[in-house]
Amino acid sequence: MSDIPGDLKFLKSHEWVRIEDNNRAIVGVSDHAQNLLGDLVYVELPNIGDHLDAGATAAVIESVKAASDIYSPVTGKVIEVNTTLSDKPETINEDPYGEGWIMVIEMQAPEEISNLLSPDDYTEVLESDEH
């Protein structure tokens, strides 16, 4: 199992979020998710300015195996997207918790963070999926 950074929160659907000061939330997909999908070939990013509700579809990633919706872990406005992924979707495969981030959301309801999984809770989800 891959190392899971301790400063992240997760959804059961394998999205991660890193909370920064000033209510900014950086969002990506977990190493587990990119491993399951295999080599990514396309990323459909949200538009800057899009309003997203927590749990709503925010982006789509496609691999040689399948397409997968990416869900927003928090409610807010998209203020930045990782345009590198348009030309190099494999960046998610290479560095899912770093350069492979997907978007930055300005959170409207920071208290939603308490609904997300801690790294330990996410590890338990992965372990229960394997059995």
From Swiss-Prot:
PROSITE patterns: BIOTINYL_LIPOYL, LIPOYL. Its cofactor is (R)-lipoate. InterPro entries: 2-oxoA_DH_lipoyl-BS, Biotin_lipoyl, GCV_H, GCV_H/Fam206, GCV_H_sub, Single_hybrid_motif. Residues 24-106 form the Lipoyl-binding domain. Belongs to the GcvH family. The glycine cleavage system catalyzes the degradation of glycine. The H protein shuttles the methylamine group of glycine from the P protein to the T protein. This is Glycine cleavage system H protein. It comes from Xylella fastidiosa (strain Temecula1 / ATCC 700964).
